[in-house]
A protein has these predicted regions:
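Compact, glycine/acidic-enriched structural inserts
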Residues: 168-194, 257-282
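Active-site beta-strand/loop microenvironment that shapes enzyme catalytic pockets
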Residues: 199-241
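C-terminal catalytic or substrate-handling cores of phosphate/nucleotide-
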Residues: 269-318
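N-terminal extension/subdomain marker
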Residues: 1-185, 193-195, 207-209, 215
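Catalytic or ion-translocation cores adjacent to nucleophile or general acid/base/metal-coordination motifs
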Residues: 224-276
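Short beta-strand segments
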Residues: 155, 220-221, 246
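Short, glycine-/Ser/Thr-/acidic-enriched flexible segments
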Residues: 56-58, 159, 225, 234, ...
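Short conserved micro-motifs at the rims of enzyme active sites and ligand-binding pockets
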Residues: 61-64, 165-166, 255-260, 303-307
């Protein structure tokens, strides 16, 4: 039997976990007040906030902030802030702020099984075009870091619910590792240690999914660029071969997929659309054309363009 997903040695803070746990560093990038409130909540307590670099601060010179992060990591390791959960896989039960419950499994994947290249047939694949220019700054931030705080979610296509969901049937028999409220009205989360004998069952179920999905097992649902950076660090011999991730079923009822819109206010619709078409090289009707519907007031206008962007989302709503 192949092993696609493994237990890990996981560091768990022994402090107030509500103040320890913060949202992913790439969130609230246009709301510095959110991060200011987080700093106020954390105060002088040990916190993940002090060993990550929120992207809201990326515009300036961050060398001093990065040095401080590295010092904090060293201090936390030396001052017994963590306990080590050896050879552990965790069942996570997250209650979102809207009341929905999301189930996941935290464990290790092998970066040799992952590729962000377009057209890859790897076991683990990206779900959006990777902007390679985003990788070097992230590599620089991680260069001297002795701890990793990942926020990567891998999705499995498991309509029969054979991997994650069966674990919840026996959760009362599992050792509870944590149970706490997340700050800033973000819901709550519980974590349970998955028994060693159950890990083999998880991998057997994953092997079946792999065979049913033509070799594709995991799709990166969140953290595409984080995982790409981890792969780049590994390739450059400056990082681990393995990455800590959470595996979630794409059929989990808590997951809702919605389009991302860009809204422009205070502009003449046709003037803006004409400028957009011109910037994209004019109308294009080729087989690889992107079709856009621009909506404004009670009207709409359809345009067809040859996309220059490597991003998955490129919609304009007026």
């Amino acid at each position: 039997m192949e092993k696609f997903f493994s237990p890990a040695d996981i560091l768990l803070a022994k402090t107030d976990l509500t103040k320890w746990s913060v949202i992913a560093c790439d969130q609230y990038t246009s709301e510095p007040e959110y991060w200011a409130e987080t700093e106020k909540t954390v105060g002088d307590n040990p916190s993940a906030l002090k060993i990550v670099l929120p992207e809201v601060y990326l515009s300036g010179d961050n060398s001093q902030r990065i040095n401080e992060i590295n010092r904090n990591m060293k201090e936390y390791l030396e001052s017994d802030v963590f306990e080590t959960l050896q050879n552990t896989m965790i069942l996570t039960l997250r209650t979102l702020k809207n009341g929905a419950d999301r189930k996941g499994i935290v464990g290790l994947i092998d970066l040799e099984d992952y590729s962000y290249e377009k057209g890859s047939d790897a076991l683990i694949r990206a779900t959006e075009a990777t902007v390679v220019e985003r990788i070097p700054p992230r590599v620089e931030i991680r260069k001297d870091a002795i701890l990793e705080m990942p926020h990567v979610m891998l999705l499995i296509n498991d309509p029969k619910k054979t991997v994650v969901e069966p674990l919840t049937l026996n959760v009362e028999d599992y050792e509870k590792l944590y149970d706490f409220t997340l700050m800033q009205n973000a819901g709550s989360v519980k974590g349970y240690k998955i028994p060693d004998e159950t890990v083999a069952e998880i991998n057997r179920a994953l092997e079946t999914l792999k065979n049913e999905n033509d070799g594709l097992l995991f799709a990166v649902g969140d953290g595409n660029h984080s995982l790409a950076t981890a792969k780049e660090c590994y390739k450059n011999h400056n990082g681990s071969r393995y990455a800590l991730v959470e595996v979630v079923n794409i059929h989990d009822s808590s997951l809702e997929f919605e389009p991302i819109y860009r809204t422009v206010f205070g502009a003449d619709p046709n003037t803006l659309i004409n400028a957009f078409v011109e910037a994209m090289g004019g109308e294009y009707e080729g087989a690889d054309a992107y079709k856009y519907t621009c909506v404004f007031g009670a009207g709409e206008r359809k345009i067809s363009l040859k996309a220059k962007s490597r991003l998955a989302v490129a919609d304009l709503q007026i």
